[in-house]
């Protein structure tokens, strides 16, 4: 079951959780709104409210008979690590560590109906056309995808964050908000220790 989290739906999340359980679903996919396309018509959450929802989702995940997956909220991994007292870089054998690489352009790509390759359906910057250069070469060699896979190239507080290798922030939301997919994720409330730069 898929759910979009925005200001108009956040209050219904406990009811949706109960519905997911009642229906016997095995996975609840919780999408945090990215203000792109028709998503611009909806009001997103502020960072503090999003943080509270992520904490609630993690707490909920410990008591429900189904899995919970977030989309466009990679900071859920940070919240999970902080709540469990785990290290900032989870080992690859850990479920959080294995899923740590899946964000726009890093473990995921979107091919449009015309063959354009994008890091995500929510990040409308093309790396080229798969009809001309091929999917594998564009994914592996384009500057756009290479930059998104290199978490040390992130800017702002995401670049300074000790969780950047397991989180990475929403590159789609950064792009939608700033025009630069390497900028900070404006939905994340976390400020790394010692960071004194600009906040989104």
Regions found by a protein language model. Give the residues of each.
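Radical SAM enzyme [4Fe-4S]-AdoMet core and its adjacent flexible, acidic
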Residues: 2-122, 126-127
């Amino acid at each position: 079951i898929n759910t979009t989290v925005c200001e108009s739906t956040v209050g219904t999340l406990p009811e949706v959780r109960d519905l997911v359980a009642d229906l016997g679903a095995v996975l609840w996919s919780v999408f945090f709104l990215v203000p792109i396309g028709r998503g611009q018509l909806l009001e997103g959450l502020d960072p503090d409210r999003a943080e509270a929802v992520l904490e609630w989702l993690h707490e909920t995940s410990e008591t429900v008979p189904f899995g919970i997956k977030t989309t466009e909220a990679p900071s859920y991994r940070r919240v999970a690590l902080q709540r469990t007292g785990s290290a900032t870089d989870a080992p690859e054998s850990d479920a959080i560590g294995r899923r740590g690489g899946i964000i726009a352009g890093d473990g995921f790509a979107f091919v449009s109906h015309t063959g354009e390759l994008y890091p995500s359906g929510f990040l409308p910057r093309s790396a080229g056309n798969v009809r001309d250069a091929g999917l594998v070469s564009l994914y592996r060699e384009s500057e756009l995808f290479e930059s998104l896979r290199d978490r040390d190239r992130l800017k702002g507080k995401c670049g300074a964050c000790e969780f950047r290798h397991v989180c990475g922030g929403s590159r789609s939301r950064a792009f939608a908000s700033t025009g630069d997919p390497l900028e900070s994720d404006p939905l994340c409330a976390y400020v790394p220790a010692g960071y004194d730069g600009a906040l989104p």
